[in-house]
């Protein structure tokens, strides 16, 4: 199971969802996946992807997660987080298939304040399964070497930045390794937008470490 918690997403997805509730509570919307590379996939890939998407329906906010978000995100009212504790991803609302050219199509249609929550988890799942099926292996030595160079540049020139890698991550394990390195050595990294990592590993407020 790739996405194991509702918090494995970017914080702005929650703020966007709340904005839709306040401004457009009855508006419907559609999230459409667009593969700019026009990658050709296999039926085995599609089967694995559908299995992961089915798993999304099992996700629930835990009491600990709810408490963490209400405490650290007071710019969103508690009633919103309590609503999220009853929210469930619905695989039946996700249309996923390969066309005749083996290109991947994904569409999710629902109320805007719900459909926006599907985007990041779906993209993270597609990315990780794609790397797995295409035999791509992360070279952690190379990743950490390049990351160290960027951290050194940031530290030297006081360049502030944030980590927003969830939707395009190679895998959840690679993202965690990168975030740990940033947390330990990047003086001007303001944090991660991934609520799960902010909650689970670093005892920092969502987004901000410093």
Q: What does each of the following model-derived ranges do?
A:
Residues 1-210:
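Ordered alpha/beta subdomains of enzyme catalytic regions
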């Amino acid at each position: 199971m790739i996405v194991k918690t509702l918090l494995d997403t970017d914080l702005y997805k929650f703020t966007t969802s709340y904005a839709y509730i306040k401004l457009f509570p009855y508006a419907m919307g559609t999230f459409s996946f667009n593969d700019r590379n026009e990658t050709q996939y296999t039926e085995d890939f599609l089967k694995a992807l559908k299995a992961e998407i089915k798993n999304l329906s099992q996700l629930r906010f835990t009491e600990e997660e709810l408490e963490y978000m209400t405490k650290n995100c007071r710019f969103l009212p508690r009633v919103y987080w309590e609503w999220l504790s009853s929210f469930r991803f619905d695989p039946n609302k996700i249309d996923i298939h390969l066309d005749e050219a083996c290109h991947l199509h994904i569409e999710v249609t629902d109320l805007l304040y719900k459909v926006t929550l599907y985007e990041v988890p779906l993209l993270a799942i597609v990315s990780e399964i794609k790397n797995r099926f295409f035999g791509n292996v992360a070279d952690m030595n190379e990743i950490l070497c390049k990351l160290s160079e960027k951290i050194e540049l940031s530290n030297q020139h006081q360049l502030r930045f944030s980590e927003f890698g969830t939707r395009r991550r190679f895998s959840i394990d690679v993202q965690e390794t990168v975030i740990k390195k940033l947390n330990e050595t990047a003086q001007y990294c303001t944090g991660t937008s991934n609520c799960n990592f902010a909650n689970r590993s670093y005892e920092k407020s969502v987004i901000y470490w410093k």
